[in-house]
Amino acid sequence: GFQCGFCTPGMAVTASTLTEADLPELDRRMKGSLCRCTGYRPIREAITAAVMGPVRETGPAPVASGGIGASVIPEAARRVVQGLEPYTLDEPVTGSLVLRVVGSPHAHARIISIDTDAARAVPGVVAVLTHEDAPATRFSTGRHEHRTDDPDDTRVLDDTVRFIGQRVAAVVAETAAAADAAARLVQVEYDILPAVFDPEEARTPGAPVLHPGRTPEDRVADASRNVVAQLHDGHGGDIDATLSASAVTVSGTWQTSRVTHAQLETHGAVGWLDEDGRLVI
């Protein structure tokens, strides 16, 4: 019933302690394990079947193993269930350094100054990077399949922050302890700016403008109204004529929940320069 397998070991350990008496409160018993992939139903079914014991079913004979239609057991299935399968960040890389990011405590602010002297003095610190070290090139953190689907609206380390947690400095050190200690010593002085937290308010006249200066060339439709993309007449035909010819029209404002297709496993990649100077990821 699992898909990515990241939550499987925790689910399996918890499920191993359950009895038939726990089934009426199964969701509460399993609340300490989160799963992004399954919607939990197949996990409930599997646990219930395991707790209740084998059930004799009537029906057609099972398909012979190895034939067409037979279940295929993934090569890593047993290792994943047992928590033995290494994930990307479980693999040690010889000579690797540790990076920690300092995030903004403000939703919208301009950085006045950053004092990194104390952080650089921590033993084991290799570098402390800020917007003064970052290229001026802008990009998007949207990360869709094609880069041009998203606006060029921020630098990798920007001198203006637009959400709580946006990175303002990066500490690189030989150990995690040194990186953590140095990150706590980075002192940032902010000029706090007005912030906006509602999409309708963001489009109203007088709302704080988050990306002034961005243009359609940056793939920002209307920076003065905080609008990154919009559809106009001409997309899909003559909208006014079609509505006029319709037997029934319905108007209103509809809202839907946000969907994030995000796995539980930390986003991670391992990269290095090979002997030919090529970046391998």
Task: Show where each model-derived region lies.
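Local cysteine-cluster metal-coordination motifs and their immediate loop/turn environment
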Residues: 1-17, 31-45
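Short active-site oxyanion
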Residues: 2-4, 167-170, 278-281
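Short cysteine/histidine-rich zinc-coordinating motifs and their immediately flanking basic loops
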Residues: 16-21, 48-52
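Short, well-structured alpha-helical segments that form the helix of a local strand-helix-strand
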Residues: 24-30
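Flexible, low-hydrophobicity surface segments
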Residues: 48-222, 249-252
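Predominantly extracellular/luminal regions of secreted and cell-surface proteins
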Residues: 120, 128, 233-242
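Conserved beta-alpha junction segments in alpha/beta enzyme cores
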Residues: 238-281
